[in-house]
Amino acid sequence: RRTPFDDINVRKAVSLLFPYDFINKILFHNLLSRTHGPWDNSNLQATEQPNPTSFSIISKYKDQISLEALKIININKPLNNRALVKKALNLLNESGWKLENNKMVSKKNKKKLTFSVITNQARMEKLLLVWAQQLEKIGVDLRVRVTDSSQFQYRLQSFDFDSIVFKYHMSLSPGNEQYIYWGNWAASQSGSRNYAGINHPAIDESINVIVNSKNRDKLIEATQTLDILLRAGK
């Protein structure tokens, strides 16, 4: 919602360095399976070839959608750590950041790139600190804040955070709740679950089609479209 995450390149750069493989191996003995979208491992997840509904909506809003919306993120080949660091640095450089004296700073005002992540789960602190160590390699300062449940809930409802740890539970028959998660009206509605502040006409139209679908096939196509757009991030 706020600087520096109002820039998609910054969001991508820091997420690239989330050490999923390391955490899965060391802390979870490779028992986890990484997800890439809200409806993974179901017929609602985005497909490699856009369906008719996807093509229609993406074409209509093509000037407002990132080219990433035309790709399926989880079919990209995984990169090694060095390649991930290089890609993250390139993304930050494109958005006006540079590494100077081991700190990522703005080219414009020399302000350091720093952000906090809040959670109410003490067990998450260990995972987030591993992420902080990874980000330190490119000069980004991540600060982990563990709060009690009441403070965490207050921060969520008032959108008072840089980033959070939150888990969405998705239905295989999505409906009106998608407005609350990703809809335009919910972006500024205190207490909604649109924590990221998503406000995009293509996403609103996808949700409209989901809610008004007359058959399962149309609902599947619209949900796959929403999945593509959420993964694209812009």
Residue ranges and their predicted role:
Residues 1-233:
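Extracytoplasmic/periplasmic ligand-capture domains
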